[in-house]
Amino acid sequence: MHLARYPRRFIAHLPTPLERLDRLTAELGGPEIWIKRDDCTGLSTGGNKTRKLEFLMAEAELQGADMVMTQGATQSNHARQTAAFAAKLGMDCHILLEDRTGSNNANYNNNGNVLLDHLHGATTEKRPGSGLDMNAEMEKVAEKFRADGRKVYTIPGGGSNPTGALGYVNCAFEMLNQFNERGLKVDHIVHATGSAGTQAGLITGLQAMNAQIPLLGIGVRAPKPKQEENVYNLACATAEKLGCPGVVAREDVVANTDYVGEGYGIPTESGLEAIRMFAELEAILLDPVYSAKGAAGFIDLIRKGHFKKGERVVFLHTGGAVALFGYDNAFDYSGRWVA
């Protein structure tokens, strides 16, 4: 599959590392655990959205855009990476941030990703978390800018459309190359799934290469039927864009949404445990919104025997640790101070 046919802005630090997690493996006593470090993509603390933005921002440039616009939750990693990419290319960036948690915490609303949005020069405006179609809302705002003569390129939440998903088709190829070069037979790949683009791109790439590695997305927002439908539809559209329609079957798309908790962006006890385990055992930082819930599901499934001893499982780290600074009230380490 020849991805060089599609315009791309090479910004990410690729390939990202593939590391074995010896201490976490020993702690859980299950499969051999590896991690794909897409928290190390390089742009403004890294994260998975940079892969998508390489293709999306190249398209924006080709269309002559002088402004990009996107939307996401208050502590959106995607928004932060979009703002950073726009700064790198000399474009203006405007972001609609949806209040999905109702939190009044000052750090949640002004620190973490929000601070970096503004440091990168983006302008932001808020929307209530009342079930708005945020992509439609964004298009309304974009039309106002266009009426003033701006050339606006809009990017859907999470960068999740067929163009953005190409970034994770490429990631699938990258991982398979790493597995092959190191002689690693991988039995499963697990990651957090939200706006669908990461999982859709991965499954399209894996199926196109006949990898025969099951992919499991741990959901962070939508119920299982809706999440799987979103991923499947986007995977089909991505395969169509690539010229290989039908490469992804419905049964190839699997999501487990048992670890969402009270809702999107609201920390869970299992997610906080995952953050502590990864930090204390492997010096790896997760975020409470995406990667921690993905890791929580992964850990629980290991404990339940879903992944067997002797298997090799890769957890794809989607990044986002900067959001920890917006969730400081979720942690109490006062007992770590020694008088």
Curated annotation (Swiss-Prot):
InterPro entries: ACCD_DCysDesulf (IPR027278), D-Cys_desShydrase (IPR005966), TrpB-like_PALP (IPR001926), TrpB-like_PALP_sf (IPR036052). Its cofactor is pyridoxal 5'-phosphate. Pfam families: PALP. GO terms for biological process: sulfur amino acid catabolic process. It comes from the Bacteria. It catalyses: L-cysteate + H2O = sulfite + pyruvate + NH4(+) + H(+). One of its GO terms (molecular function) is pyridoxal phosphate binding. Homomultimer, maybe a homotrimer. Belongs to the ACC deaminase/D-cysteine desulfhydrase family. This is L-cysteate sulfo-lyase. The lineage of its organism: Bacteria, Pseudomonadati, Pseudomonadota, Alphaproteobacteria, Rhodobacterales.
